Amino acid sequence: MAFQKLNRPALLAVCALALAACSNPGPSAPGHGLDRQLAAITSDPVLGMASLSVLSIRGGRVAYQRQFGMRSIDEGLPATPETMYRIASISKLVTTLGVMRLVEQGKLDLDVDVSSYLGFSMRNPAYPEQPISLRMLLSHTSSLRDGGGYSWGVGTSLREAMRDTQGKWDADNRPGAYFAYANLNFGVVGTIMEAVAGERFDRLMQRLVLDPLHLGGGFNPSAMPLEQWRNIATLYRKRAPDAGPWIASSQWIAQVDDYAVRAPVPLAAIDSYKPGANGTVFSPTGGLRISAADLGKIMLMMLDQGRADGKSFLTPASLKVMTMPQWRYQPGRPNGDTYHGLFTQWGLGVQQFESRRGRGSSLVESGGFDAAGHLGEAYGLLSVFAFDAVRRNGMIVLIGGTASDPATTPGRYSALTRQEEAVLTALYASVAP
């Protein structure tokens, strides 16, 4: 992918946007101070971002939403309320909403051996007697691992991919006993969903989740209308897509979704694809494109006990199952990989964050935000979806690329990055009691 050079018109657009961002008040805006604070973070020479889209909810209502930076740097196009992002692993939470809809319809059972859905045996070779369930897959306790890959093309079935077991299983921990975050879990989940519904994953999620909640976007950009795919944010890093040094003072380089002037290309041979063969094709793990505003609709539904627009989308019982911890870290006898303290409790497709100040997954410096949700990171994007169901508060953060390598800018008070900490701590002012 070519370097994205910032020409003079684009540079002028960036400067104009910095001013415009502060003069575009959102719902119940808490004042221009937060606008200026977030604009300064976005344009910081070290922590700076290609684009930023945020939304906060307070007491069950949208309190603040704003966009900063450019969705397409080369074309000089600003991020807008309609701009969609490839939200990375927050997609897993949305995929889980689809799973729970199928559970409520009686098509899936969280505790049945998933082999019965897949049509082939899904077993850890080290523990062949132990069935694997959807509950294990959704809570990352299945013993699946990503070392052998977690995404394959249309021409490869999941059955074929799983025949080579190297790197795909944990030989030391029995399924259900140990947590280790793995994308492959949700590739299997997507395949199961297709198998029981007889429908391609992208279309199934449109029918189960996106259409009922009146959301734009989807898991397949090539199927979107022009007005949607042209508003997908290009994701950037200040390094080549696959290798090379990360230089904060250099040009932004497009990584994925460079659709400002070129339409998304349909997946090769997709018309011959058989649903249930390989759900990884549409990336249930991270491939959803959606705006912060539409993620806000999902969050409001979850804060309203599964109701949206006066109708039931999910039952309160289903949401409780999703958010209730299925796994908790036990320091006395380690039962999971916490990823440097970031993961300590998981439900089904939902993480429980620490509310105490100074803990690994604490989202704000002051502590006190008792939240559940999901994080995401891929191709330069950093994303946060977090809500407090008791106080009915929440925050959504979509960062379209960071000037510095996040690995070199670790957080000061958590296992998050410094970029995420800066935005979350500032945004929390719009939801804090």
Question: How should each PLM-predicted stretch be described?
Answer:
Residues L382-F387, R392-T408:
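Short, well-ordered beta-strand elements
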Residues P125-F369:
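Short, surface-exposed loop or secondary-structure junction motifs
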Residues L12-L17:
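Sec-dependent N-terminal signal peptides
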Residues G31-Y85, R159-E160, Q166-K168:
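Short, conserved catalytic-motif segment at the N-terminal edge
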Residues T323-N335, S355, E365-G367, G400-P433:
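Short, gly/Ser/Thr-rich active-site loops of penicillin-recognizing serine hydrolases
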Residues A20-A21:
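C-terminal motif of bacterial Sec signal peptides marking the signal peptidase cleavage site
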Residues P45-S53, D74-M136, A171-L184, S283-G286, ...:
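Short active-site loop at a secondary-structure junction
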Residues A2-L11:
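Bacterial N-terminal signal peptides that target proteins for export
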